Amino acid sequence: MTQTEMLKVIARYGYNVGFGAKKNFATYDIICKSSGWISFISLAIGVFALFIPQLATNVISAVLIIFGVATMYIQFYDSEKENYEAAGIEQTKVFNELEVIYRNVRSTANSNFDYDKTQKEVNLLMSKFYSTTISKQIFGSNWYAHYKFFCELEKDWVEDELKLTIKDKVPLSSCFFVALIILAAIICFTVS
């Protein structure tokens, strides 16, 4: 494997590790924060419904019940939240170590590039990563992880090496979801 190919491989691993770390942090954030926000919003709507008749409808009540069920779903993950945080921290460390290896390989002259040494270092880090992965993630963590990875993490080396575009940065499912909402809004406004 050439030095250029190794840089691509390390960047690809970096993307997977960094995204995995952010997905764990996304799940952790959703578990910790969303139940409180859902409860607060539901309570606020309930209080305002006491003196704003438009809020005291069956539709609003149904939405509040759905919020309550969503809170119950989120609570199923509560006992595991420390595991998500710990996995995110360990995977972030692996991501940072991969960046160091990437920059070392990039700054090494072609004639001095040691494939075997680099491959061993990368394999060791990837073993650490795989030992910390958690496959069961909460609903919505994938979208939130995209935001956390592309907006919060210093990952220019991954973006530059893999030549990531906006297509890679926005989840396809979110584009479909937005299109579905727009279509539903158009249908609702044309029917009424």
Per-region residue spans from a language model:
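Conserved non-transmembrane functional hotspots
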Residues: 1-40, 78-170
